[in-house]
Amino acid sequence: MTPTLLSAFWTYTLITAMTPGPNNILALSSATSHGFRQSTRVLAGMSLGFLIVMLLCAGISFSLAVIDPAAVHLLSWAGAAYIVWLAWKIATSPTKEDGLQTKPISFWASFALQFVNVKIILYGVTALSTFVLPQTQALSWVVGVSVLLAMIGTFGNVCWALAGHLFQRLFRQYGRQLNIVLALLLVYCAVRIFY
């Protein structure tokens, strides 16, 4: 990879990993509501699911030049529906001030989110088809970069969770408002899938 292409790769992957999306918003919400330690299951589920999705993206990108538009469209609708459901769960979740103790979303729910998370699927397919496959078609490189993409995504999730933990007091004081803003951001993510 040339220095210019490498620079573009890092810019794309870091910006994509650090911008709001279903994973980052869920990580922030979970750490704000339950603390960083109790959110580790959520982060672990996201990380494992992210890695598997990146490896699947590698397989798809490696074997197909163009993804069937009908499959992408169906996946987009499924992803949008799940994201809107997640937004509803966050918007209606009780805050500490409500006096109810709730558990963070489960490992398996955060794991399952990855398979309908259009943002990370497009992230993986775009990074691989734009930056890797034009340079090399060595399977080891494609798989290696897929693992790197998952690590970069996990880094973004952890950063958002740490922000939720560090600003927990402030977020708890304005918990209801934060939940509504996060839910609206998720709805925005769902709408952006189509526009």
UniProtKB/Swiss-Prot annotation:
> Cytoplasmic face: residue ranges?
29-46, 91-104, 163-176
What intrachain disulfides are recorded? none
Transmembrane region(s): 8-28, 47-67, 70-90, 105-125, 142-162, 177-194
- Alphabetical GO biological process terms: cysteine export across plasma membrane
Question: Where does the UniProt entry say this protein principally localizes?
Answer: membrane
UniProt family annotation: Belongs to the Rht family.
Indicate what this protein is called per its UniProt record.
Cysteine/O-acetylserine efflux protein
Source species of the chain: Escherichia coli O1:K1 / APEC
